Amino acid sequence: MGIGVNTDLPRNEQIKAPKVRVVDENGKMIGVMPTRKALELAREKGLDLVLVAPNENPPVARIMDYGKYKYQLTKKQKENKKKPVQMKQMKFRLKIDEHDYQTKVKHIRRFLEDGHKVRVVVMFIGREMMFAEKGKEILERVIKDTEDLATVESPPKMEGRDMWMVLKPKNS
């Protein structure tokens, strides 16, 4: 099913451990007991015994409705797939130190890898408006540094005291 989420947890008779630490359906710790006794406890409540942390000592098993759990898990995965592409924004100043520039580009790259569009803005304060060409150079450098991940959706343009552009991921 989903990547990184194990939906097939050992449950009921599939649990091979002789003893398990049991957590009830409300999340309350019951304690360590033989697997048989824990299974009987789950059956009395009409629920399943699911091994949620097999690598612990003793393994942790939870009493829950496994069918309901699996349904909610697949529902959550479908919801995550539907999330819309967000527009992220990264602001630069005209006088930016190299390390700060690299950090911001790293964030832009992460946004693009996550499938988001990125609006890159160079802000001009006071007399910096005379150096609009330097702002354009910063934006072109960002384009060059992200060309493996992004394409330019809207080229650099001046708007008030800001110069901005929009990058979109190549795979979209």
From Swiss-Prot:
InterPro entries: T_IF-3_C_sf, T_IF-3_N_sf, Translation_initiation_fac3_CS, Translation_initiation_fac_3, Translation_initiation_fac_3_C, Translation_initiation_fac_3_N. It comes from Thermotoga maritima (strain ATCC 43589 / DSM 3109 / JCM 10099 / NBRC 100826 / MSB8). IF-3 binds to the 30S ribosomal subunit and shifts the equilibrium between 70S ribosomes and their 50S and 30S subunits in favor of the free subunits, thus enhancing the availability of 30S subunits on which protein synthesis initiation begins. Monomer. GO terms for cellular component: cytosol. It is found in: Cytoplasm. NCBIfam families: infC. Pfam families: IF3_C, IF3_N. This is Translation initiation factor IF-3. GO terms for molecular function: ribosome binding; translation initiation factor activity. One of its GO terms (biological process) is ribosome disassembly. Gene3D superfamilies: Translation initiation factor 3 (IF-3), C-terminal domain, Translation initiation factor 3 (IF-3), N-terminal domain. SUPFAM superfamilies: Translation initiation factor IF3, C-terminal domain (SSF55200), Translation initiation factor IF3, N-terminal domain (SSF54364). Keywords: Cytoplasm, Initiation factor, Protein biosynthesis. Belongs to the IF-3 family.
